Amino acid sequence: MDSTKFLIILNGEDKTESIASIKKQDDVWHITFANTAKTYTYKYDKVIFLTNPQRHTKPEKLGIYNAKFALIFEKYCKIFFDNGTTKLLETAILLPNVKSSNANVFLYCKELATIVGVKNEDNESLLSRAYNKIDMLVKESVLSNYLHPSQPHRTNEINAPILSPFGLNASQFQAICNALESQISIIEGPPGTGKTQSILNIIANSLFLGKNVAVVSNNNAATDNVFMKLEKYGLTYLCAKLGKKDNIKQFLQNQSHTYPDFAQSITQERKDTFSQAIKKLNIQAQEIFTLQNAIAKQKTMLSALELEFHHFTMQENLTIRPHFLTLLQKDSTLLLKTKIALENTPKGWRYFLLVCKLFLIQRIGNFTFYKLPLQDIIQHFEYAYYMQSIATAREILTHDTKRLEILRDTQTLEHLQEYSLTLLQESLRIRYGTHTQRPIFSEKDLLTNAEQFCDEYPIIFSTTHAIKNCFGRDFLFDYLIIDEASQVDLVTGVLALSVARNIVIVGDTKQLPNVIDSTMSQQIQELTTRYKIPPHYDYMQHSFLSSVCSVLPNAPSVLLKEHYRCHPKIINFCNQKFYGSELVILSEDNGEANVLEAYVSPAGNHARGHYNQREIDIIANEILPNTTIEPQEIGIITPYNEQKARLQNAVGEIEADTVHKYQGREKDLIIIATTDNQSNDFIDDSKMLNVAITRAKKQLKLIVSYEVCHKQNTNINDFIRYITYQSAKPIESKIYSIFDLLYKANAQARALYLKGKRRISQFDSENIAFAFIKDILQQDSYHSLDVLPHIPLAKVIKIDETLTQEEKLYAQNPLTHFDFIIYHIMDKAPLLAVEIDGYAFHHTHKQLNRDRLKDSICKKHNLPLLRLSTTQSAESKRLKDMLQALL
């Protein structure tokens, strides 16, 4: 019968084309087949006979590809493919009303695969061949959610205990929960934050739930790391390393009929006890994690306070009298509020009453102390603030550390790991331990018997571009974990999405993306334009990870915050610069010397092409002879292959390579050789610098040219500023660095003093200005800058012989201040002073003279000063223009 007009399903199979006639009589079907004249009878419920189909000439709108057309017979869809074959399926699994723009995205990726895919010996794209296996998008696959983001995401209710046999921290626990409960979840894993541990625990939980999981990456190194950890726990009997043909062949040849010895069985009562215990331990563990992270943050804050105090004592011309400090042992906030009150109270009877109140009632200072010059009084208060803040931080650290030791004595985390491993092993014993012999699979079984294969080997390893070829075209994994997803290109990632019901995407948007061959750019751009691709699917603009984050902004995402790898001084630059200070640094600072050093080669053109002999000499003659670190634990990173080759010849056994080759690796000492004389987008790329820095565990040395070092508003310049500030060595300058911890606390105390928590000044104009300056500095162009209000001029400008006597007196007055100082975050160096000039106030003779003095002082010390008027518009633009000019 004509299969374009009729559909006959007999005993669940489409038999339309093999039937000559069909007739219903008395609740019985009479069917005559085309190859015989005999008529057979079938019970009514064994046959489905449908007519008058709805024809779809654009099957891509149903998420169907490689097809001429599709016919809808009520709840069935029959697809007629280009190659002459047909397929019948229920319409419930199809995507209804696919928008043409969404269909275009898939077709765009499919055509891109012919351009960007690796070619075989016949010049055929392997990616393209895999794309040709995708006939349709089904609701169950993650690919349908990515291409149709408005489609509801499936959620999973998990009643089983959350296992953590590989160890755990707070962020990792959230990552596991997200992975198990959500169809799509994202793990942002900065370097050294335990991405592999998170992946292992997700694998463990998927096994415990009886599921299978595929672990893929753009290279084998990342997945090999996961495999080796599973090997350590004796779990590789569950793994199949597939992907390319050689891997499949090797795996099939090495199969064994036998299972390993399983752990001794445990009773159901014990299993129930462990399950309940794990649920309770997971709750108790959160208290440990919270306290552990609080201690780490407190250590970071204490370190910053001590470093700033060190700069304060070096920079200030201190006349501190220790016996007065004993009278100022008060809460740090109270000290600053008192200082501000003294600054804002004019000399006279009101000042006298304030002093009486301070030392008679509040017991702060004494009459002798308050007879000192106001400048000295303020200096004592600021010194006491640091001492008190540091003492308080140490007290909190001591208290929290003792509390953590008490909690750790309960061995909560050890029991959690032990019970998790026991339950996992028991579930695997039940799943496999009763089998007498393990089946042996053939290559054909991978295509026709994938479900049984993945029951036996529920952990599959592959590269991202090869995972589609591992099994039959319609097979879906329960879970797919894509590691190093920032390095996976969009086309390959989309292909991987087609093989999974649930996906966990692991990567770091702050690290290197995939590299796009520049010779392909024009072809790619032409396709993007022709298919009218939305920006978040644009191959040139996005890696797979960044595209998913853009397409699915509401997908559960967690940043792994706890960092274990790098010395705190190394990682804290990346933390401040790239991660918004969200990382919790759990590595230890034991006061090691020379953790960070910058070597600046003299001015001059030392680079020739893409190599720099001066840098090679610095490494060979200055850095390496003075290190005690073993050669195998030293790595040299350079942007260019030519410099890499020359370095390798010069330093022999020490490994030199490009930053792309170092991603995912680590060394005790990393030497970054920037090579070029001039800063450019390539060597100053934020992601390259982030990767390069975070390879170093114990020490990092940076080599730059004089020109690169002094190029403003660059990532490398920010890093050099950071290194300089961390060295805590005095810097000869007419402008002092800003004590930002002191003056941030000062601004908060000032707000309390003014009884307006959001106000930093009694003048509305200054409050408005502060708000719009903060808004401007939030923009990417100014991410390395911050602003502080009401900074005393003497804290910024060095009082030297270039100033007149009148200017010195004005500058030394404690009440003389800048309305705002915009400064570099990394070394606290002032960039710009900002004054807010009200018309009436600033046009008095007295104020005009003060403004003249301030302008002259700033000019002599090369500190740019911008005056913003309360009577003029476009002040925001003036500030932006000034910042742009300075940077």
Role assignments for model-derived ranges:
Residues 580-649:
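Conserved helicase/translocase motor-coupling segment
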Residues 35-37, 42-44, 51, 56-178, ...:
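Pre-P-loop entry segment of helicase/translocase ATPase cores
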Residues 475-481, 665-676, 691, 699-702:
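A short beta-strand element within the Helicase C-terminal
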Residues 57, 83, 152-265, 322-330, ...:
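ASCE P-loop NTPase helicase motor core
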Residues 1-55, 237, 244-249, 253-406:
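Charged C-terminal transducer/switch regions of large nucleotide-driven machines
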Residues 102-167, 337-476:
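Conserved helicase NTPase catalytic core signature
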Residues 519-558, 679-781:
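Helicase C-terminal subdomain and adjacent C-terminal extension
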Residues 733-887:
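Nucleic-acid endo/exonuclease domains
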